[in-house]
């Protein structure tokens, strides 16, 4: 069994949660603030990223951070290209901790339009994916947001997610598809029904390929059970 096959098996059957270690430039100051460092602790962006990397390294090297509790970790691109205890970060996570490495690939959300926020364009995606594969990344993560029960907008969100997911699959990586439904959505249950229909249409056309779905807890019990049981869905997280 290859390392990738071992990771596939763990992602399908293992226990634990996926740790988010993917703060980008916009969210890093808040993350460091919660950690106890205010903006006086750095003079420029480079120093800020050095500090947040040290914070992440402290987290992942802690004895409690292991594959017994954690399925995977989502990394920012800088973290993917960095090291933990002198070892490439992705190799450290898997070989030392048995934690599956993922890469955050989206560049944030576009402005809200018709009750949804699509992802901003991802320039150089092909190169990013090639670099991720070279660094032994297992999969990717990308997020959109649905704020209203607008069927057309929800279809657009799902269309964009799966269009990019196909490119990710072609590169040999497993995408986490995340069309988040805002918990404050006035017609959340209705929006989730539209979302279920849109996703089912797409996963039915994946052939033998598999994706991971990251979905908001639905209003209706077991609404997404058909997706969790779908042969083309590795896991719902």
Would you name each region that the model predicts?
Residues 1-138, 146-148, 198-202, 207-211, ...:
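Alpha/beta catalytic barrel-like cores
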């Amino acid at each position: 069994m290859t390392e990738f096959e071992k990771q596939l098996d763990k992602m399908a059957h293992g226990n634990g949660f996926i740790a988010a270690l993917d703060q980008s430039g916009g969210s890093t100051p808040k993350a460091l603030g919660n950690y106890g460092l205010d903006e006086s602790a750095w003079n420029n962006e480079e120093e800020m990223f050095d500090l947040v990397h040290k914070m992440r390294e402290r987290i992942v090297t802690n004895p409690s951070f292991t594959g017994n509790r954690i399925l995977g970790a989502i990394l920012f691109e800088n973290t993917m290209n960095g090291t933990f205890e002198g070892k490439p970060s992705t190799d450290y996570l898997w070989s030392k901790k048995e934690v599956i490495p993922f890469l955050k690939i989206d560049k944030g959300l576009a402005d809200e339009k018709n009750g949804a926020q699509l992802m901003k364009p991802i320039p150089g995606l092909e190169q990013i994916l090639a670099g991720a594969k070279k660094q032994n990344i297992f999969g990717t993560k990308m997020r959109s947001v649905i704020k209203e029960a607008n069927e057309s907008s929800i279809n657009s969100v799902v269309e964009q997610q799966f269009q990019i997911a196909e490119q990710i699959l072609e590169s040999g990586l497993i995408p986490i598809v995340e069309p988040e439904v805002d918990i404050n959505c006035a017609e959340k249950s209705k929006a989730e029904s539209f979302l279920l229909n849109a996703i089912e249409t797409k996963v039915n056309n994946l052939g033998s390929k598999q994706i991971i779905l990251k979905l908001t807890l639905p209003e209706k019990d077991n609404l997404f059970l058909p997706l969790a049981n779908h042969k083309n869905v590795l896991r719902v997280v």
